[in-house]
Amino acid sequence: MESPLNYTSANFEQAALTKFRSLVTFLPQSSKICREPWGRSTVLCINFENCPHLFSVNQEQTRLLFQAIASLSLADSIIFRIGSKIVGWKKVKP
C-alpha cells in the first residue's frame, strides 16, 4: 500500500517551486520555473519561452524574486531564458 504522503526529494522540490510561484505572482503563468545545477551551485531558471513578449522584470520585481528565493533557499543565482538562450543572470543577494 502506498503512503498518501510521498516524501521524495522530487516532491519537495516541486512543492518548493509551487510555493515560489505563489510568492511571485507577477510572473506569467506560462513561464517555466526550474532549478538547475551550475558548477557547484544551483540556479533558478525562469524560462519565458512560451511568453517572450512578457519578458520584463523591473527592480522591485527583482527584489521580490530575491526575497522569495532566499526564504525558500532555492538557489544562488537566477537565470532568465527565452528557450535555450540566456537573456539575463542575477546573483541572489543575501
Map each language-model feature to its residues.
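Flexible, charged surface loops at secondary-structure boundaries
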Residues: 37-41, 71-74
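Residue-identity detector for glutamine
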Residues: 13-14, 29, 59-61, 67
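Short, charged low-complexity intrinsically disordered segments located at boundaries
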Residues: 40-45, 91-94
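A short interface-forming secondary-structure element
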Residues: 43-63
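Hydrophobic, Leu/Ile/Phe/Ala-enriched alpha-helical segments that form helix-helix packing faces
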Residues: 16-24, 64-69, 73
